[in-house]
Amino acid sequence: MTVAAIAPTQRVAWRNTLAWRVVLSVVWSLVVTGILILMAGKNPLVAYQHIVLGAFGSWPRVVVGLNKAAPYMLAGVGVALCFRGNVANMGAEGQIAIGGLAASVVALIGASALGAAVLPAALIAGVLGGAAWAAIAAAINLTRGVHEVLVTLMMNFIAWLIVAEFLHGPMGEIDAGFPQTPMFENVAWLPKLVARTDLHIGIVIAVLAAIMAHVVLWRTVTGFHWRLAGASDKAAHYAGVSRARSVFGLMLVSGVLSGMAGAIEVLGVHYRLIEGFSLGFGFNAIAIALLATLKPLWVIPAALFFAFLETGALSMQRQIGIPSSLVLVIQGLSLIFVLCAVGRGARRV
């Protein structure tokens, strides 16, 4: 066979890769959004220019985007793993909230007693809080037969009510204009990744978590069991894979990662617990996991894409008056195009 005969086949194969379809989906979302901007009487190129400048125009803006991406990555990886194992976990929002609450309790109470050890203690508390909240949902699903979508969605609202109760009660700062706790002691703050900046080590933790999740999913027996359970219940059953163990394990991992996301947000960005501190993070994590086609490593660029879109949109709104909510259109269209592209690719196979 000649090189000329091979080349067209290689080009077709390259164009049919999942990565190419995802990139093309994002491009199409930008094109369609650009048409909507044009219909509104604005220049889409100018709008996108301000988004890019707002996200990358200065180092402080880049820092904001990286800090925002860290919890997105952590929660997104957890959701991606659950969806891979056919566990429809919609509860990352609540797990983040409980993780942030648990970390805040330790940061406030333990600063004087634990000293420098309060930071790792607070992070562990956040992880345990998120894991416990996820475990409750898994237990209800497995013991009472209530579908995980319903359980996890309802528990999101309960989690935020619990956080609100603490902030309006014993943990709330007196005479504050907003429901929040007092500022944490410096020893409870996440270390900075770059000196004299606000960039904390959360982004490193998130990237490492995504890499570890990839290794577990594709290089361990546990990961194989999760993938098998997600691919076929019958195949998993005949292979001796326990669905209950898979569901509980995946929910625990998701709770650990989401709890860590909540802890990182309160210890590294706000330095206190604030009502609504991560509102929408869990649902963004679902979109990020789907945009990444449930691949833990792909969650990294997907989370960065979401985070920098959101930070850049504020600049666009200030400069040319286009609402920052436009990024929701871009995110939504990207997700729709990706899901369509993935489904089309699956039918071809």
Segments the model singles out, each with a brief description of its role:
Residues 252, 257-332:
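Transmembrane alpha-helical segments in multi-pass inner-membrane proteins
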Residues 148-219, 272, 326:
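Transmembrane helix-bundle core of multi-pass membrane transporters
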Residues 11-20, 40, 83-92, 113-178, ...:
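Short loop segments and helix-boundary regions at transmembrane helix junctions
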Residues 22-38, 75-79, 100-106, 127-132, ...:
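Hydrophobic core segments of alpha-helical transmembrane domains in multi-pass membrane transport
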Residues 1-28, 34-38, 211, 231, ...:
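Cytosolic-side transmembrane-helix boundaries in multi-pass membrane proteins
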Residues 33-42, 46, 50-110, 123, ...:
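Single transmembrane alpha-helix segments in multi-pass membrane proteins
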Residues 14-21, 53-67, 91, 116-121, ...:
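Interfacial loop-to-helix junctions that mark the boundaries of transmembrane helices
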Residues 112, 195-272, 296-297, 301:
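Helix-loop-helix "hairpin" substructures at the membrane interface of multi-pass membrane proteins
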